[in-house]
UniProtKB/Swiss-Prot annotation:
Binding residues annotated for Ca(2+), in chain numbering: N117, Q168, D177, H211
Recorded name of the encoding gene: Amyrel
Enzyme class: hydrolase
UniProt EC number: 3.2.1.1
Species the sequence originates in: Drosophila orena
Keywords recorded for this protein, A-Z: Calcium, Carbohydrate metabolism, Chloride, Disulfide bond, Glycosidase, Hydrolase, Metal-binding, Pyrrolidone carboxylic acid, Secreted, Signal
One example of a Gene Ontology biological process annotation: carbohydrate metabolic process
Cross-referenced PANTHER family: ALPHA-AMYLASE
Binding positions for chloride per the UniProt entry: R205, N307, R342
Name of the molecule in the record: Alpha-amylase-related protein
Amino acid sequence: MFKLAFTLTLCLAGSLSLAQHNPHWWGNRNTIVHLFEWKWLDIAQECENFLGPQGFAGVQVSPVNENIISAGRPWWERYQPISYKLTTRSGNEEEFGDMVRRCNDVGVRIYVDVLLNHMSGDFDGVAVGTAGTEAEPRKKSFPGVPYTAQDFHPTCEITDWNDRFQVQQCELVGLKDLNQSSDWVRSKLIEFLDHLIELGVAGFRVDAAKHMASEDLEFIYSSLSNLNIAHGFPHNSRPFIFQEVIDHGHETVSRDEYKDLGAVTEFRFSEEIGNAFRGNNALKWLQSWGTGWGFLPSGQALTFVDNHDNQRDAGAVLSYKSPKPYKMATAFHLAYPYGISRVMSSFAFDDHDTPPPQDAQERIISPEFDEDGACVNGWICEHRWRQIYAMVGFKNAVRDTEITGWWDNGDSQISFCRGNKGFLALNNNLYDLSQDLNTCLPAGTYCDVISGSLIDGSCTGKSVTVNEQGYGYIHIGSDDFDGVLALHVDAKV
């Protein structure tokens, strides 16, 4: 009897973890955008006016729970919780719930960045949060939850990143480290996440997951409610989980400890795609992209060119500040069938601590748009760059097809097909790409969605004529604005 019960428990845990890899997208949609630090009302409008019509699958939103108020309002104050009240600079609970409903109604799922590892760091005296809650972080006193010192791990500093105890039980950059093995802490975290599920979210990005024991996270995830069917989720749907685990391949705490619980952020993807499109690796090597590079299996990998953290660091990672290679890397990211794709939508920053665009009263301001739909008032909005949102459409058009017809020049000019539905060419050399290439597409004329759009049957950019054999003449000059060309069956003239 015990053996049977144990077996059933294992089977249930396994089925739940598999379900937590499902992002619950509508139809053929398959790209998430991180609208970093946007207000809830603005996200609702963006879902209705842009993301839904352009075929985006979901939005990762900034942390929703009350946070400490820091001088100058740096972005990272959102990662210093003070309670689980849903009031931040992005809005209150009513506005959040309205946003989730409106986005779900147009087929755009919401994934919340959640902080389960810690509360805020030290603060002199009494700290006040964005909902007016008081706390004394130095004493580990957070009455808004409530948490007291007994709910935290003993105070210690991470000095050795190869020491599992330090990584998972000491304080990450001074943030008060919760004890997730405590029944009380578990109950409060589950209560918080379940409330968000009731409001209609599709899942969670789990911040600092590697700093929590995988067995504690497994307990928390498996205890969560199913998704809310009132928001269009099928019965018994589990929340999509993707976990921040920074693993460069030599970490004591490995990404592999978390990959069966949900998807894992594949940071090596970000680093290597940056290396390639900065010219440090020939693009020809990308033919084996994905698991051939030692990355996680596709369905377990959350992939990105940059995120809100590493875009602020020095190194190979690309960001909006290098627009041509960034757009090329993003085009490859969205065209190559590997991973669960997320694109970044940033605000301009000059240093690591730059706050989001704000007014004189330190209130976040709404993005404004020019006549072409681009953001103009401190918001970068990469997701509104034509070269990026067009590739979201490309990814939708070629869903469930494989790579065929790979071509390269032995260096950094490459092209490939996605079945007979799409074609991508890239030129990262200092000389032109001018070649008859197999597009694998049916005969006809196609609009290059990178340089223009198909409007009323006419292409506003380049077009390529494909012959009966599937070949077309492809030209990408070394000094072209974008360095990439993309064709697909939904952009046939």
